[in-house]
Amino acid sequence: MAKASESLDLSVNESTDKALDRDCTTLSRHVLQQLQSFSADAQDLSALMNRIALAGKLVARRLSRAGLMEGVLGFTGEVNVQGESVKKMDVYANDVFISVFKQSGLVCRLASEEMDEPYYIPENCPVGRYTLLYDPIDGSSNTDTNLSLGSIFSIRQQEGDDSDGQAKDLLTNGRKQIAAGYILYGPSTMLVYTMGKGVHSFTLDPSLGEFILSEENIRIPDHGAVYSVNEGNFWQWEESMREYIRYVHRTEGYTARYSGAMVSDIHRILVQGGVFLYPGTVQNPEGKLRLLYESAPLAFLIQQAGGRATTGLVDILDVVPKKLHQRTPLIIGSKEDVAKVESFIQNGH
């Protein structure tokens, strides 16, 4: 009896130790551990990730008070480089990222979905060897209805001095990314990232003001029941995509989930498996999502988790953009589900 009690005590202690170790693993500590196998000149990435986390905290705080503050909800009346009406939260979140990095000495350039051209920080150049590419608010149409939103980020190393200010070195494939991830603003605020060594998630503990490790080395299931797509665009798609939707409608075991915020939908698929689709249309075959700010960062992360991301014909990470704001179709998620969508598209071609 004493031995059984002793064994139980050891088991409880081990469980407690693991929980305590996890609770003590902050984002900054975890990133430093990841960087142990990187070269010495990559250590700035720890400070860079901390700045991204700070931007996420500031945006999360603003969103949590959105219904109580003036000038947070609604549109600005302006149109961005994408031709889309700009939400007030789009502007605020974009300004937050600029402000957080402006005096950091870490990045020379910021490239955002919301800005026509990269934002240069001369005082950080050439010391700041990195470029941050980001979508400050993904799913901004959800802002006024208190639904989930996100931010997407990607880190690349600057190549050359960019003396002509054209940022041509960014027009390379997604395999040049050093790190990528997203921040999900939902019932809790989560930060999920990869540095090419697995995918790791952190939850913001409001009492500590720290992102604490939630799960390490996340693996996406090979197959999932969820398909996530805006079926309101059904009649605008190519016939091959419509055939895929008909297939999931008549096949038992599939369920549709679509929130209007890609980060939210991708996070569900990362955890539960399935596929997210944002295909091109007959009139706009290039699709809607921006390659550098949305598709490539999420493709890097999902592939690190064991999933896949494609245009339907080409791996997203192999697409070389011709311009900063280039769009691309996106099919991303569990490898078996992505392959199923590909089979319809490729047979249609």
From Swiss-Prot:
GO terms for molecular function: fructose 1,6-bisphosphate 1-phosphatase activity; magnesium ion binding. InterPro entries: FBPase_C_dom, FBPase_class-1, FBPase_N, FBPtase, Fructose_bisphosphatase_AS. Signal peptide: none annotated. Pfam families: FBPase, FBPase_C. One of its GO terms (cellular component) is cytosol. Mg(2+) 1 binds at E113, D135, I137. It is an enzyme of class 3 (hydrolase). Substrate binds at D138, G139, S140, S141, N230, Y258, K288. It is found in: Cytoplasm. Binds 2 magnesium ions per subunit. This is Fructose-1,6-bisphosphatase class 1. It comes from Trichormus variabilis (strain ATCC 29413 / PCC 7937). The lineage of its organism: Bacteria, Bacillati, Cyanobacteriota, Cyanophyceae, Nostocales.
